[in-house]
Regions:
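Bacterial N-terminal signal peptides that target proteins for export
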Residues: 1-11
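N-proximal helix/coil linker or "cap" segments that precede and/or mark the start of modular domains
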Residues: 10-36, 106
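Short, acidic, Ser/Thr-enriched surface-loop or helix-capping motifs
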Residues: 28, 41-42, 140-141
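A short beta-strand-turn-helix
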Residues: 37-58
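Thiol/disulfide oxidoreductase modules built on the thioredoxin-like
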Residues: 54, 107-114, 120-164
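Short pre-active-site segment immediately N-terminal to redox-active cysteine/selenocysteine motifs
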Residues: 56-58, 62-66, 133
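Hydrophobic beta-strand anchors of alpha/beta hydrolase catalytic cores
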Residues: 59-60, 90, 137
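Structural microenvironment flanking redox-active thiols in thiol-disulfide oxidoreductases
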Residues: 71-111, 121-128
Length: 165
């Protein structure tokens, strides 16, 4: 009976191995040139990420007010911004899933952030960066090349930023 339980567990879990291995490969390719897509400011004005890309190293986080991984990542993100904020442009892109610009504005009023926050109304930025989920971080070097992508509440943002400097 013991062998059959082990066999059954292996059989049930083996399809998950490729998914776990592929998790690090999700998103825009490291080495790719970042797309200069447009997003919106929280007051509805069109903003092109191309205005920032290629001018200075940049950290972009795709996030949501309701995302637990984003909340877990926030202290690490703020520490990195405090340390590297004069050298790196930090940008948050709020995804348009279960939140509105108004909800994001209310959240930011209660939890002020030191960096620019934009809204991805049509999901074009998330699509262009192939963002697999919220808490997805992309770090660009000063030429606009992707040097890091990561997902989840525990990321080495300081190490990622050092790759861009």
């Amino acid at each position: 009976m013991r062998l059959s339980r082990t066999f059954l567990a292996t059989l049930l879990l083996s399809p998950l191995v490729p998914i776990a291995a592929r998790a690090q490969d999700l998103g825009i390719d490291v080495g790719a040139k970042a797309p200069a897509v447009s997003v919106q400011s929280l007051d509805g004005k069109r903003v092109s990420l191309g205005d920032y890309i290629g001018k200075t190293p940049m950290l972009i986080e795709f996030w949501a007010t309701w995302c637990p991984n984003c909340k877990e990542l926030m202290p690490t993100l703020l520490d990195a911004e405090k340390k590297f904020g004069k050298q790196v442009k930090f940008v948050a892109i709020a995804v348009a899933i279960n939140q509105s610009p108004e909800k994001v504005r209310r959240w930011l009023a209660a939890h002020p952030l030191p960096h620019d926050t934009f809204y991805d109304v049509e999901g074009k930025a998330a699509g262009a960066f192939d963002a697999p989920a919220t808490s997805y971080v992309v770090v660009l070097d000063k030429t606009g090349k992707v040097v890091y992508t990561g997902l989840g509440g525990k990321q080495d943002l300081e190490g990622a930023i050092r790759k861009a400097l």
